[in-house]
């Protein structure tokens, strides 16, 4: 197994500890991932697909002759690992879930518990209004109001913010088809409050929009830590639970953004444009969206949180 793969599994083990999982689980889960990594070697773990997992299932069941309960535990560990990769924005989808759903009965019994948590507008309001720190409030509001990824947020520089036009210009990435996203008056208010005090923290003349306490660019892990802590304080995140629906992280903000725009009746094409989803079909290239109409629709549909 390559060095970077070893480091990835070690980071996953540390994440299990941070989540408060039992010590035995923190040892067994990474061991299960290592065994799978050796099985698919030299393919990287991030590139594993359903075919690899079905082959591994066959190997465990027919060659190793493991009992059903043991196989289910192995795939539970793998599913948790790939959920972690999604959280770290290293992959887009968990390849384990479809295999569990079709071939492992335990997954069918617990499928509902593996759904990503969706909080209500009222809970989002409670979350935001519980935040006292101006930086943290601006971070959470931007994540909720724009649906941008954690990595996109941390890569923002101060110069990427246009308060007059209420837009963010994101850095180019392979995951996003657009670079300009909108925010509303509530997010603008939070940003203004943060920018007013930002210079006091900018002891290293860093261009980043969001700074750490040391005056350096805030990293993804820092954003993840502050979001989960704030959510835990208001009862929206349970770090000791293995159930996905009891966790709340920056990616849940993107889930919240998308789902509540859908529920408010916004055009799905507009939502895809705001999310920056990559266009997969040739006809999508010809689907030009009017930016003024897009902005007006966004402002009409984005939920208000009463800050």
Each language-model region and where it sits:
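Catalytic-site neighborhood detector that most strongly recognizes the C-terminal catalytic loop/helix
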Residues: 275-300
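C-terminal secondary-structure termini that scaffold catalytic or DNA-interacting sites
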Residues: 1, 301-307
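DNA breakage-rejoining catalytic core of tyrosine-based enzymes
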Residues: 91-93, 104-125, 175-186, 202-206
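N-terminal core-binding DNA-recognition domain of tyrosine recombinases/integrases
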Residues: 10-24, 30-110
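Basic, Lys/Arg- and aromatic-enriched nucleic-acid-binding interface segment
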Residues: 121-150, 177
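Conserved tyrosine-mediated DNA breakage-rejoining catalytic core shared by Y-recombinases
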Residues: 155-190, 281
């Amino acid at each position: 197994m390559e060095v970077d793969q070893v480091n990835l599994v070690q980071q996953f083990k540390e994440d299990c500890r941070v989540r408060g999982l039992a010590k035995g689980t923190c040892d067994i889960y990474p061991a299960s991932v290592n065994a799978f990594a050796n099985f698919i070697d030299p393919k990287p773990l991030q590139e594993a697909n359903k075919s690899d997992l079905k082959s591994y299932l066959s190997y465990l069941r027919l060659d190793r002759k493991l009992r059903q309960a043991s196989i289910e535990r192995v795939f539970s560990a793998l599913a948790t690992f790939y959920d972690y990769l999604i959280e770290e924005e290293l992959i887009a989808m968990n390849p384990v879930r479809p295999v569990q759903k079709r071939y492992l009965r335990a997954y069918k019994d617990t499928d509902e518990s593996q759904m990503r948590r969706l909080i209500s507008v009222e809970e989002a309001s409670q979350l935001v209004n519980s935040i006292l720190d101006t930086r943290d409030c601006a971070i959470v509001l931007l994540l909720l109001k724009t649906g941008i990824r954690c990595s996109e947020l941390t890569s923002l520089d101060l110069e990427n913010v246009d308060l007059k036009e209420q837009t963010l210009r994101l850095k180019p990435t392979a995951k996003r088809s657009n670079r300009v996203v909108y925010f509303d008056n509530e997010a603008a208010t939070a940003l203004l409050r943060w920018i007013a005090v930002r210079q006091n923290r900018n002891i290293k003349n860093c261009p980043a929009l969001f700074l750490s306490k040391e005056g350096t660019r805030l990293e993804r892990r820092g954003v993840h830590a502050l979001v989960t802590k704030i959510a835990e304080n208001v009862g929206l995140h349970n770090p000791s639970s293995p159930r996905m629906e009891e966790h709340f992280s920056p990616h849940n903000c993107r889930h919240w953004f998308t789902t509540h725009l859908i529920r408010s009746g916004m055009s799905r094409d507009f939502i895809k444009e705001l999310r920056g989803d990559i266009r997969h079909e040739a006809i999508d290239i010809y689907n030009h969206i009017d930016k003024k109409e897009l902005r007006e629709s966004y402002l009409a549909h984005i939920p208000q949180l009463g800050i």
